[in-house]
Amino acid sequence: MDGLRKLAVAAIAVLAVPPLFSQPGVVGTDSGKLQGVTQGSVESFKGVPFAAPPVGELRWRAPQPVQQWSDVRAANAYSADCMQVPFPSDAAPLGTKPAEDCLYLNVWRPAGTNADAKLPVMFWIYGGGFVNGGSSPAVYDGSKFAEKGVVLVSANYRLGRFGFFAFPELTKENADGMVGNYGFMDQIAALKWVQKNISAFGGDPANVTVFGESAGGFSVSMLLTSPLSQGLFSKAIIESGGGRTNLGGQRYLNTALPNGPASAESVGIEFARSVGVDATGKDALDKLRHLSAEQVLGNLNMATMNQPGYAGPFIDGRVVLSDPQSVYLSGAGWHVPLMIGTNSMDIGFGFARDKEELFAPFGNDREKAIAAYDPTGKGELRTVQYQVSMDRFMVEPARFVASIFASEGLPAYEYRFSYVAKSMRSKWPGAPHATEIPFVFDTVQAKYGSELAPEDEKIAQAMLNYWVSFARTGDPSTANTPAWPRYSTATDMLMDFTENGPVAEKDPLKARLDVTAAYVTSSAPAPAPKLPARP
């Protein structure tokens, strides 16, 4: 009882102290003036529209301009996240109720920043398999970046069938090729907003770093390889975002490869049939646009991603030229400094019935694969299969992308996040997918609450400093952190975030990744033809 009384008194004391909020100066954008909120040393502007609401006749269209407003607009709360079926075990639970009207962004900056400050800008892209996610989760709060002198921007983008949908009539309606990958178009539109407006917030439009995790990392790969993102950013960070393939496989707009997934248009036609719309009817598209948001949404979320009707990115030839690997190898894409990495217990999956089936695809390198992944022959199938699939899907592709950038003389830095929060060490043998995010944002208090340990905070502060330094200079190393060596194939060095702190080391998974690289290279699709040259 005594402990409960102390908690009650503490709670009353907290409630009795007014929050340190005040009204900052008004900021003007190309659409109108904004009034944000100051909390301590940080000013935030939330729920800022960067495109017209994509509803009604604007459903399944490229983002359109915002209607200007004349009064000062209050920018004091997150807008709705984009339409989705929330995922119960999401590592970043939403802070708002999803809605179709969702194309809004958020800005954090140091309080009192002048318009001519030219601070580095960081643009965050959330993950969620392109069917979940949003900018409102507490772990994505940009305040700690602002405290370090960064202007941080996060933006919503359309998800699921709202963000990634193809249909024959849509293709005919958009002769310019801006069809299907609306979620990516939203990201590009938000980055264009940054170029036009961020200087009013004290940010430098010539120093923008895009960074994202999982689907957000795949999105950064898209931005690095899309001709439509030219000049919109100057650095990139990919967290657990693959790098060789598109999420969802080698799906095309209206064709399908042998043994590949159905075309995006075929998926759209099947969806129309499922809601009683004749895909060949003259009014089919009109009927689809008049469906309720709930009808379009269906049951898509991260738990149903393996269903045939998954609505994710596809190759359209305009926004998405090809799979990232083909674009990188063809010499197309954008020359920028890069940070890239994965977690020590990142995404892995597989369906092999035994080890014979698991290692058979390695062909002539089968014995090398066994030596790398199961040297004693006593490893559990589930564990070995997980490591093989994790390396194939996440870890080796990250090294591949780092090697491509390094070979072109670009600064490339690879990391591995092995740190496990102290309160989770009895449950997790390694760092699962997405667990680095609260450490990058230094929002570990929001994530772990009373279970937060001092060593957790120390790693969070180190990671935040590395990310900020990279955004500021293109080099993550700082005077107060261990030096982070540039990646090269000759040294294979990376920065591992461990329970002992950041450790620069030669990649201990090199043998595994070498044999996996040989396999994925031999089984990769042919490079796409006629890709534009990298400028």
Give each language-model segment a name.
Residues 21-181, 446, 450-463, 472-483, ...:
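Non-catalytic accessory segments of hydrolases
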Residues 1-9:
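Bacterial N-terminal signal peptides that target proteins for export
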Residues 9-10, 20:
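Cleavable N-terminal signal peptides
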Residues 66, 275-287:
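Short, charged, surface-exposed loops that flank catalytic or proteolytic processing sites
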Residues 158-161, 211-215, 416-423, 482-488:
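Short, solvent-exposed turn/loop segments enriched in Gly/Ser/Thr/Pro and often Arg
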Residues 87-279, 318-322, 326-353, 407-410, ...:
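Serine-hydrolase-like catalytic core of hydrolytic proteins
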Residues 235, 247-248, 253, 283-455, ...:
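Substrate-gating cap/lid region and adjacent catalytic-acid/histidine neighborhood
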